[in-house]
Amino acid sequence: VTLHRAPFRSRRLALAALACAIFLASDGSAAIVRVSPRDDLHRALTKARALHDHNPAESIAVEFAAGTYRLTAPLILTARDSGSEAAPLELRAAPGAKVILSGGRSLRGLKWFAWRDGVWRTRVEGPSFNRLWFEGRLLVRARYPNYDPAKLPFGGVAADAANPSRVRRWSHPEGGIIHALSSDRWGSIQIPIEGKGPDGGLRLGGAIGINRTVIPSDSERFVENILEELDAVDEWYFDQNSHWLYFKPLQGVSPARAGFVAGRLEALIELRGSPAARIHDVTVSGLEFRETETTFLKTIEPLLRSDWMFYRGGAILSENAQRIVISNNRFDELGGNAIVVSGHNRNVAIRGNEIYDIGASGIAFVGRPEAVRSPLLEYQQTQPTAGLDRAPGPQSDAYPADSIAEDNLIHAIGAIEKQSAGVEISMAARITVRHNSIYHVPRAGINIGDGTWGGHVIADNDVFDTVLETGDHGSFNSWGRDRYWSADREEMNRRVAADSSLVVLDAIASTVIRHNRMRCDHGWDIDLDDGSSNYLIEDNLLLAGGIKLREGFNRIVRNNIMVNNTLHPHVWFANSGDVFEHNVVMTGYQPILMNHWGESIDFNLFPTADALGHARGRGTDAHSAAGSARFIDPQEANFAVAADSPALSIGFHNFSMDDFGVLSPLLKARAQRPIMPEPFVDKESGQEAPRELLGMTIKSIETLGEQSATGLPSMQGVLVLAVAQDSPADHADLRAGDVILRIVDDEFGNSDPTNTAAELAAANAGRRWRGEVVFEIWRQQRKSTAKVHLP
């Protein structure tokens, strides 16, 4: 054993057969097991355990020297590896060291042979793999259509991805995968190809990836891992039967003999206690986790009645654990989840990490269904109230609670699995999600999958560029679907009228969404869906999508700013107890199938007297006001209102505008920030500058000359000045000289007049979640309609 003693150290430590260097601190309070990439990390953990057994009061650290550690198996820590509150076990990088824990294996000594069409091949022995890197760069598994990072979803899709004419070219498609969005764009579906049938058609396995009875899209799909589709530079294919690895380099370049890394592991560190022996007091810090295999074919566990299927694994997994700290790490190039906090966990802190370029979710707090009373596992399932367990709250402690995700930078996630989130919470209690920056995600930035058991705090986050590859969702999304919930709304009204206590059997504590900045250009900024209940939403700056409240009970929404958008109330129940007060909205409400309007909708600021009048016509907003909010400096992200703003007269108060998102200087320097929208404001007659919308250049009809030229019976509507080629407006056959009179909603019977360009822009913003919008237009002195597909 190599024994490093600091000055004045007199006590000797003899540990037989230990090969790693052990440094003993001078005060006798700490010992460090120093490891390098050539050491066996599992043996290092054994040495740390021996040190702890020798002196349980001593702090133990496993300290990694700089380098890449290619693990052959995950590092699994159990209750025996626990530290104490005063002296936790630490897994950490040496000061200033760049330490990478990799789940990949190096492929060395490769002998490449030219094959055909610019493709080379080499033999690779060992287990199969589904991820391949060259010099740290992820390569593309052979696919159709070819990968283009600028195209969404999936880097490109094609309706003919699995057409019979294409399939006929495939000699051995077994092992291939069809990736598709669901037809309603609620998430992704993966379908394994098992081979060909007697008729030459594909034999397919079961669809994986989403907890709803849905069909895959006919058009938004691609196929991968098919040899015959290997036709682009940097594509590869591995034949697991013959062990040939095929690769297409740049033309005229032969592949290198080294520098290739194949995926091997799905997990890198697992903190695994048991119900009888929890692991506790462990810190993981300063490490980089990368190069893990995909897990999408294992994403098969339904998370109650949410839309999610889930895989309980990630680069770091914590289960049956207490007082765990995961801090200042980097997670990138992962095939699945980054951090999964599964089952019983208490006082887990996830702070200061950067998570990006991964296949699934960033951070997930997910309890076990055995902790849930009367659990159901699919949207359409229901149960009679007579059979419900009426005891409130959980029935066991197999769930995460009293934990925090704070100051994390999470971006470019969900590369493979589109039903994913920056932070996911399901079957958990009292989780705090604070000061995180989350952006460039395919679906929600933050998702709460069910009502069990509330008490969460979502605060000070910066969440934007969300719902980029799916639809009908938000930067923040939640479902309720608690034990009493039914998809039959009339049945729900009957149940709650008979026993109002049902609504808080699972959602036993209020969830707070406070002081966040959110922007969703393809859905809602905050989306409380399907029975989400017991929420307080206050002091949020919402930059694009507004707030949707569907079904549910006891939602208090107050003192929020909805830039260029509004409240979207959908199918509220009788006696819902909902409150919407002291908010700034910038267009009229967008109700759908509303027969009941909650406890109080009042004291709000509308942009125009017309919008306020529409609200009052429905029986709400008796004390609300209309007028410009008078934001101080929107271009510089300051949407505080001026001292003379009418917002102050309805009880709105300003909140801070400069402390959203990550706090750490390093992460703050790396984090992007959302683009600030220009508020839609009507200009004085004759003073309006043209603006851009959906590829059109538009302005309000505001002069007699414009009215006369277009043949309008009155001075109203929005004049189309120009249409950009290949834009959404161009595809809808809108033309220069058209006048847009109103937005028509075929499905729900709502429509909005668009007398000005500002009204058109705001009304369009309120409908982005639908994916299309129908305009009533005036062309050659006749009315017609145009359907525009929204980007």
Regions found by a protein language model. Name each.
Residues 14-25:
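Bacterial N-terminal signal peptides
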Residues 32-330, 371-395, 637-638, 648-682:
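Extracellular polysaccharide-degrading/modifying enzymes targeting complex plant/algal/animal polysaccharides
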Residues 63, 70, 76, 90-92, ...:
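Extracellular beta-strand solenoid repeats
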Residues 73-74, 293-299, 335-341, 359-366, ...:
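Short glycine/acidic-rich loop motifs that flank beta-strands on beta-rich extracellular proteins
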Residues 280-291, 322-336, 346-360, 372-391, ...:
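Right-handed parallel beta-helix
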Residues 676-718, 722-725, 774-776, 785-791:
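PDZ/PDZ-like peptide-tail recognition elements
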Residues 684-693, 700-704, 723-728, 733-756:
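Short glycine/proline-centered loop/turn elements that form peptide/ligand docking sites
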Residues 732-735, 741-742, 755-791:
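PDZ-domain C-terminal substructure recognizer with occasional recognition of PDZ-binding tails
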